[in-house]
Amino acid sequence: MAGHSQFKNIMHRKGRQDAVRSKMFSKLAREITVAAKSGMPDPAMNPRLRLAIQNAKAQSMPKDNIERAVKKAAGGDAENYEEVRYEGYGPGGVAVIVEALTDNRNRTASNVRSMFTKAGGALGETGSVSFSFDRVGEITYTLSAGDADKVMEAAIESGADDVTTDEDGHTILCGFEEIGDVSKALEGVLGEAETVKAIWKPQNTVPVDEEKAQSLMKLIDNLEDDDDVQNVYSNFEVSEEVLAKLSA
């Protein structure tokens, strides 16, 4: 769990510092449109759309942008995006999972493969690394939601599996199938969550040194910079000393 938390935290901080808002909003809008197109355009009747909108709001995406993304799906003029997952190994044999929404599988696959190759890694077949991850729900709250004891008690009552609290906030994990029920129960006690999403949580982590960590961060940065890529997950773990250097 420590490795996953470290990875989450470093990506969280780096994302805050480096993210280009227009690109981030574009990716959030794409998820909203795909979610709205996959079911009812009403978030009350479409759990995926409700989560997509909630996460967009957490990133301060303007209300007009959110409504436009929903209407785009309802209007029938939205591009046909496919959900694809790529799996491979980065520097040091670290497992990497890439989730994308694309209207051109060949383009996206070529771009992702090229990034892995340039980083000294290799793209594998679907399933080549995901067996070493668990698909779980992740619900995050800011520290203002309450102290660690209050959040822990709420998480236990809601049926969550794990809770961690650090300087970035509270992170609650639950079973993939229970995301909706757990997040709803938590909302009744703690208020609206900062984010609610499904993630790939590594079963075990791989320790890496500073050089490998820098290479991995560069690979992940490049992947996240691709317009089609929505999420990137990995299983590397770094020491507190290296973490401090990379976060500086």
Curated annotation (Swiss-Prot):
GO process annotations (BP): regulation of DNA-templated transcription
Signal peptide residue numbers: none
Keyword Transcription regulation: yes
Cellular-component GO terms for this entry: cytosol
Pfam families to which the protein is assigned, alphabetical: TACO1_YebC_N (PF20772), Transcrip_reg (PF01709)
Localization per record: Cytoplasm
Keywords on record: Cytoplasm, DNA-binding, Transcription, Transcription regulation
InterPro entries per UniProt: Integrase-like_N, TACO1_YebC-like_2nd/3rd_dom, TACO1_YebC_N, Transcrip_reg_TACO1-like, Transcrip_reg_TACO1-like_dom3, YebC-like
Any one GO MF annotation of this record: DNA binding
SUPFAM superfamilies from the UniProt entry: YebC-like (SSF75625)
HAMAP family from the UniProt entry: Transcrip_reg_TACO1 (MF_00693)
Family recorded in the similarity comment: Belongs to the TACO1 family.
Name under which the protein is recorded: Probable transcriptional regulatory protein NGR_c27950
Natural source organism: Sinorhizobium fredii (strain NBRC 101917 / NGR234)
